[in-house]
From Swiss-Prot:
GO terms (BP aspect): L-proline biosynthetic process
UniProt-annotated location(s): Cytoplasm
Annotated protein name in UniProt: Gamma-glutamyl phosphate reductase
Keyword Translocase: no
GO molecular function: glutamate-5-semialdehyde dehydrogenase activity; NADP binding
EC number: 1.2.1.41
Native source organism of the sequence: Acinetobacter baumannii (strain ATCC 17978 / DSM 105126 / CIP 53.77 / LMG 1025 / NCDC KC755 / 5377)
Enzymatic class: oxidoreductase
HAMAP family for the chain: ProA
NCBIfam families hit by this protein: PRK00197.1, proA
Length: 421
């Protein structure tokens, strides 16, 4: 069986590499034609795709998937509509491929510049979310990359149904149907092959639980664009407008629990804790959010708040649990975030411009937010059209990874017969 998986993955890799050579030189109009055809195919097959998703949901419930995974897995009509809107947004994005920048003459008379080009073949490994299949495929096509998609077994039927619509659109436009391939086996050996096929795959993008990301990071022989988890914070500073702070901290935690940009720790300045905490605690109680607090938080709110442990400060709950800590000021808040956070998304609520700038400069995260919810850390909200993932690394791409994150630059040299003396 291992040999057959290896052969299957080698075939997928070769097909992706061949397709990438065609996509590299595909015009913007041709790529947009393919994306428009995919949009039409998805619209025409919405009922079948949602039915396939229900099969996955039923299997998920039977297999007792936790609520966070089930939430990510589910495709409602509203989420399907959001997927289509994301695809529309990608179509109208400016195509970065072929863009030439920094063109300048050298004393020798040659011109030196940089041209933006596709990465080549992207390998994507993800869990649960079938909408990622379309987001990743659309961004790959628009940026001239082939992509190999390895979704979780729990979303296999949904992913296959979406992939059929994508293939149809590619065929209509005359682009290789293997530009986008979904791995149609649940054999875990497929992941091991995908992350080590350096001859076929140029970059790996894993999206999922911490154990998946750690495995890919440790075993991959290919560059990885990743974030381990989303332990996000909101710091309500002493000069915060509480009419802003209350809805921001409620939204950051309760808008959706099972996402990487949800707040997991609330930090409150000691100068306003006595006033702010009872109000926000009442709102969290209505949403049945369990609070785990520091001693000062428990003194203010009472013993109904569970004592927070050291582990709580590190934890991405992905559920209705929130750690709460009262801090002495901005320095302690920033130190806490940089020590316990995951460098994903962290926010401050304050009316003090100087402190807001200080927070922006000193918090070591891929997205830093002032007076808004952490839930905005998303490619769609950032105007990227969609995102293939979020990176907390500092090399190549950081934060939500959209079209430009799936490209690199090569040097171009333009001469008129010059030789080096």
């Amino acid at each position: 069986m291992q040999d057959s998986i290896e052969q299957y993955m080698q075939k997928v890799g070769q097909q992706a590499r061949d397709a990438s050579r065609v996509l590299t030189s595909a015009s913007t109009s041709l790529k947009n034609h393919a994306l428009s055809a995919i949009y039409t195919a998805l619209e025409n097959n919405q009922a079948a795709i949602l039915a396939a998703n229900q099969i996955d949901m039923e299997k998920g419930r039977s297999n007792q998937l936790d609520s966070a995974l089930l939430d990510r897995l589910e495709l409602t009509p509203a989420r399907f509509k959001g997927m289509l809107q994301g695809l529309k947004d990608v179509i109208v994005l400016v195509d970065p491929i072929g863009e030439i920048t920094d063109l300048a003459y050298r004393p020798t008379g040659i011109q030196i510049g940089k041209m933006r080009v596709p990465l080549g073949v992207v390998g994507m490994i993800y869990e649960s979310r079938p909408n990622v299949t379309l987001e990743a495929a659309s961004l790959a096509i628009k940026s001239g990359n082939a992509i190999i998609l390895r979704g979780g077994s729990e979303a296999l039927e949904s992913n296959k149904a979406i992939a059929e619509a994508v293939k149809h659109g590619l065929k209509v436009a005359g682009l290789p149907e293997h530009s986008v391939q979904v791995i149609e086996t649940s054999d875990r050996g497929a992941v091991g092959h995908l992350i080590t096929m350096a001859e076929y795959v140029d970059v790996i993008v894993p999206r999922g639980g911490k154990s998946l990301i750690e495995r890919v990071t440790n075993e991959a022989r290919i560059p990885v664009i990743k974030h381990l988890d989303g332990n996000c914070h909101v710091f309500v500073e002493a000069q915060a407008d509480l009419q802003k702070a209350l809805p921001i901290t409620l939204n950051a935690k309760t808008h959706r629990y099972g996402v990487c940009n949800a707040m997991e720790t609330l930090l409150v300045d000691e100068k306003i804790a006595e006033v702010f905490l009872p109000h926000i605690a009442e709102l969290y109680a209505e949403k049945q959010v369990e609070l785990r607090g520091c001693p000062e938080t428990r003194r203010i709110l009472g013993s109904s708040v569970k004592p927070a442990t050291e582990e709580d400060w590190y934890t991405e709950y992905l559920g209705p649990i929130l750690a709460v800590k009262v801090v002495s000021g901005i320095d302690e808040a920033i130190d806490h975030i940089n020590k316990y956070g995951s460098h994903h998304t962290d926010a401050i609520v304050t009316e003090n411009y100087t402190l807001a700038r200080q927070f922006l400069a000193r918090v070591d995260s891929s997205s830093v937010v002032v007076n808004a919810s952490t839930r905005f850390a998303d490619g769609f909200e950032y105007g990227l059209g969609a995102e293939i993932g979020i990176s907390t690394d500092k090399i190549h791409a950081r934060g939500p990874v959209g079209l430009e994150g799936l490209t690199s630059q090569k040097w171009i040299v333009l001469g008129d017969g010059q030789i080096r003396q």
